[in-house]
Regions:
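C-terminal and inter-domain tail/linker signature
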Residues: 1-92
Length: 92
């Protein structure tokens, strides 16, 4: 079950979405994973990379069932230029 409204359910839905991005010349790149947290059958990954060339944070939450991904939620946010930050804490 996919909760990203731009992606259809299932592996084929993910493949179709990534192919559509590639046709538009948009790359979704994960460069670094800062933490992976798990509790029960939920796993959260907090990562950084680029989306369409822009610095981006990725938060992916999966629900695992019988050893397979059963559900996925995600949040992507463009990381603002450091000169605009209101603190020195950073995104991660």
């Amino acid at each position: 079950i996919q909760h990203n409204t731009a992606i259809a359910d299932g592996v084929s839905g993910l493949n179709e979405a990534l192919a559509a991005l590639a046709q538009q010349g948009i790359q979704m790149i994960y460069d670094e994973t800062y933490m992976v947290l798990a509790q029960g059958n939920f796993v959260l990954a907090v990562s950084e990379g680029t989306y369409g060339g822009e610095p981006t944070s990725y938060y992916d939450l999966w629900r695992v069932e019988s050893g397979k991904i059963a559900e996925h939620w995600d949040v992507m946010e463009t990381i603002a230029d450091q000169s605009t930050w209101q603190n020195d804490n950073g995104k991660f």
